[in-house]
Amino acid sequence: MAEYTLPDLDWDYGALEPHISGQINELHHSKHHATYVKGANDAVAKLEEARAKEDHSAILLNEKNLAFNLAGHVNHTIWWKNLSPNGGDKPTGELAAAIADAFGSFDKFRAQFHAAATTVQGSGWAALGWDTLGNKLLIFQVYDHQTNFPLGIVPLLLLDMWEHAFYLQYKNVKVDFAKAFWNVVNWADVQSRYAAATSQTKGLIFG
């Protein structure tokens, strides 16, 4: 059975400075993300053992652990692709039009996304996703890595608001981190995800 693996980054750890420090990116990728990858692989192995023993309490526990760690792995894999040293500015083309249609303007979208990020209670994410059932863009607060994000929503843009993503540089002023994020958003990646979500997910929920 194939194992989950830690992805390589498209840029050096220090490439997002001064907006996100190299120290944060190195720890975030090589330690925190790596821990979720290991946790997901460990949960899969323990699930196999529990199923062989027909130990349903252990099965449920490890399914829960897998959901948490695999979601952490998935979210971070998107997170790294959503960032670029050549990022910033605004989206263009179909994504820009869809954002304006859904939120009224890019500035209104940005304000709503910023509010979602900075008011997360505890650990979580802000997420822009494509609703494959309603055919529209939506913003969600994601609690931990997987809660409050409905099935059928395709993540396009994520902002990690766990303290490990910003505390070494921004301390408790997470609002400044959320503002700095816009300087390194890789809109080309978000546009690519939007194009795939709107063209390849029809019938995903209801055939």
From Swiss-Prot:
It is found in: Secreted. Fe(3+) binds at residues 28, 76, 160, 164. Its cofactor is Fe(3+). Keywords: Iron, Isopeptide bond, Metal-binding, Oxidoreductase, Secreted, Ubl conjugation. The keyword Hydrolase does not apply. One of its GO terms (biological process) is detoxification. It is an enzyme of class 1 (oxidoreductase). GO terms for cellular component: cytosol; extracellular region; periplasmic space; plasma membrane. PROSITE patterns: SOD_MN. Binds 1 Fe(3+) cation per subunit. It catalyses: 2 superoxide + 2 H(+) = H2O2 + O2. Its EC number is 1.15.1.1. GO terms for molecular function: iron ion binding; superoxide dismutase activity. It comes from the Bacteria. InterPro entries: Fe/Mn_Superoxide_Dismutase, Mn/Fe_SOD, Mn/Fe_SOD_BS, Mn/Fe_SOD_C, Mn/Fe_SOD_N, Mn/Fe_SOD_N_sf, SOD_C_sf. It holds the Pfam family Sod_Fe_N. There is a cross-link at residue 202 (Isoglutamyl lysine isopeptide (Lys-Gln) (interchain with Q-Cter in protein Pup)). Destroys superoxide anion radicals which are normally produced within the cells and which are toxic to biological systems. Belongs to the iron/manganese superoxide dismutase family. Homotetramer. This is Superoxide dismutase [Fe]. It comes from Mycobacterium tuberculosis (strain ATCC 25618 / H37Rv). The lineage of its organism: Bacteria, Bacillati, Actinomycetota, Actinomycetes, Mycobacteriales.
